[in-house]
């Protein structure tokens, strides 16, 4: 069986190389009469409140055009509908149903779970023990989702054998362009999501509308997002508490890794009523973080009212003693002396649809609220 699959894979790659991207695997049966792209005009667009890195335009016949800023355009074609004639060469065709997805961008999983669309994911770029989302971990344990290799080293045989009809990547794929090219030669379209480039924290959550479009459940996606925003309106409308907050972790080299003032975490602190301690920290690089020598971190953050340790990258801390093992200089910080030091939970990075809860947690620690209500932060003892 493995030899047969490998032979089919080799043949598919050869055909893809001879015929161009997307021709190795035929799309689902098409029954509608062909339409001309030049004759198609948008009828309406998805309303966006915070997101700036994508748009969705609707066309007659159930077609939707997703435009990802500074990246690509994707035409979502309804099941059994024909691909329009004369389609622009840069538009990637995504034929519904998209029900055998290779999900590489781990931050997207939480949005599929929220949409009750886990069954559309067949393959994962994250191993079972790498998931902090219980539903994803259980689906892999049950054999419903198969590990198919990380973004830079996918298992093409497994992916092809699963009749994969979409790969969802993040911009890391551009570090290995040959992988994207190979997937496309197999007839597997690659959707590159850029939610991490959203300037507004809630814009990241709003990408659920993209996946609602891909999966044919836009109304559900829009309601989920609206409910999330409505749930923190009370916090967003409160006056700022005026407390300063640092958000950091200590690297293996002993430096303090902090967020730039333009990063979404810094913005969430502001939305929660706080003031990010490094509110003027910017540079021209695309990175959202900066490594500071401890002396510089001491000078900038020692008087912060609240300290939050980022455990999504480093190990999770439980006590102040564990924090001071990272650097004895931290003992002189105001928040350490007053016992106002907190740590994030490890599952924070993958919990894309819980950013509203993180804003609420930030507000709780900034406004001296009830710590028993916290979901993604805990106090260091």
Residue ranges and their predicted role:
Residues 64-68, 74-160, 166-172:
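A short, structured surface patch at a secondary-structure boundary
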Residues 16-20:
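C-terminal motif of bacterial Sec signal peptides marking the signal peptidase cleavage site
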Residues 100-103, 120-124, 166-170, 190-194, ...:
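Structural recognition of the beta-strand scaffold that forms the well-ordered cores
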Residues 99, 106-113, 124-135, 175-178, ...:
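Extracytoplasmic ligand-binding site segments that recognize negatively charged/polar headgroups
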Residues 21-109, 220-248, 370-381:
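Bacterial Sec-exported substrate-binding components of ABC uptake systems
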Residues 198-226, 306-381:
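Structured C-terminal subdomain patch of bacterial secreted/periplasmic proteins
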Residues 1-8:
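Bacterial N-terminal signal peptides that target proteins for export
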Residues 231, 235-318:
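Flexible, glycine-rich surface segments
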